[in-house]
Amino acid sequence: MMRGLRSLADQGMADRLLNPADAMAVAREKLNALHGHPVAPDTRVNWTELGGVRCAWVQVPGVDNASPCLLLCHGGAYIAAGGDGYLFYAEMLGRACGARVCLVDYRLAPENHYPAALDDLVDAYRGLVNEDAGEAPGRIAIIGDSCGGALAVATLLRIRDEDLPAPAVGVALGGWFDHETPSGDREADPIRDPFAHPDFTRARGLDYVGMGGDLRNPFVSPVYASLKDLPPLLLQVGDVDLTFGDAERLRARANADGVDTTFSVHPEMIHGFQGLASAGIPEAHAALAEVAAFISSRIR
């Protein structure tokens, strides 16, 4: 797998994926093309509103209302994909975890700056556990990938601070946990991770917070947050993912704050590798099996 990815990088493909020099329209076009896969005919998609926020219930065969619920904070660099573009990812998680997936179609940047996306996720969660859906919090996992990993942790912080009933767990897959100094002190090798660049994640963070916004805001970059009293966390990352150093730092912060944290590193895996399960990549399937086991072991 990695040989093929390095070959793409050597051919210059890395310059055409997640390139910080791209105009907004180009960046969106690339990200939408990466994520906009169709779902299987036997997957049910029902669009609704939770807490006034557009959401999709994605249900695969064999899953019913008694199954666990995943609240999905989608990736797409804050600027792209949207709910419609992440249905395939919700389907993939639903199949791997045997769960219903609630995909939140949060407002995108730069048209909507922080805290718009986070407000939408918190409002959707409030609707999920209150009158709109009445889901049991102990049967819910909040999960996100890439920028959605940061949003998932930020959502947990807001749930804690607003005294909402806590979900069972949080899961972050290659989360963008620090937008001010992406990847921390770790030297990134762009050939080893051809799909990510620190300047790209920083630029998208600026799109999210807007002019004059604070990239060190703990609800934007959770490495600067107090994580005390959060539910159990799974931080899963590839060891050549550009965000690896950020995940290490968040793990250290979580441990210091007494959070039950599982830190899982997958050798030779790049940013977003979990999404390759839809292409049949064994390493991605193994990662999602780990996610499923983590969630099932803690769902009440």
Describe each model-derived feature in a short phrase.
Residues M1-V63, I299-R300:
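A glycine/proline-hinged amphipathic helix-loop "lid/cap" segment
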Residues G12-A14, N46-R300:
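Alpha/beta-hydrolase superfamily serine-hydrolase fold, recognizing
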